From Swiss-Prot:
Alphabetical keyword list: Host-virus interaction, Inhibition of host innate immune response by virus, Viral immunoevasion
Zinc-finger keyword on record: no
Name of this protein: Hachiman anti-defense 1
Mutation effect (I41 to A/D/G): Complete loss of inhibition of Hachiman host defense
Ranges in a coiled coil: none
Function, as annotated: Counteracts the host Hachiman antiviral defense system.
Disulphide-bonded residues: none
Subunit field text: Homodimer.
Length: 53
């Protein structure tokens, strides 16, 4: 498995798929301020558990 980038929308409680469009997942304008775009690099597990957040 290769590493890959994954971009999602998050509000700290939920994660929604980012479809490539810069549109917030909520249509309600007051809720749009709560969503942030986040990008992560997903890497295969190498068995080295020394890295911790």
């Amino acid at each position: 498995m290769e590493e890959f980038k994954m971009t999602v929308w998050t509000n700290g409680k939920a994660i929604r798929k980012y479809t490539g469009q810069d549109k917030h997942p909520d249509t309600n304008p007051s809720k749009r301020m709560e969503w942030f775009k986040a990008t992560a690099i997903i890497k295969p597990d190498t068995g080295d558990n020394n890295e911790r957040d």
